[in-house]
Amino acid sequence: TLTHNILPRLMDYAPDFIVLQAGADGLEEDPQSGLCYSNHGYWSAVSAFLDLKIPILVLGGGGYNPFTTARAWAGVWGLMIGQNPHTTECVPASRSVLESLHFPHRLGKNIPERWVSRLYDRQ
């Protein structure tokens, strides 16, 4: 696991900085996903790296469902400025942006309300 295997070895290496590729294509509702993790798990992993207090460059990448990708990355940005995305509802401006997205996939035909109303998938 991340906290028991990867992070201790990373700390043994004592990096000056971390480059974190925060791809969103492993999220459960991504059409390319074979991993099926929630954005809670995604954010928990990002938080674990941020908690190391090592300078970090977070890069976006991967993510083929624009709704889940936008919400996941917004949550990462929130974490980086000290906000808690795990319970964050979308403000009207962000909801408007999400509602305007086009997702030409079977998952995009009848989008769930939660894709435009909140950042988190489920509690």
Task: Indicate where each model-derived feature is located.
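A general "terminal functional-core" signal
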Residues: 1-123
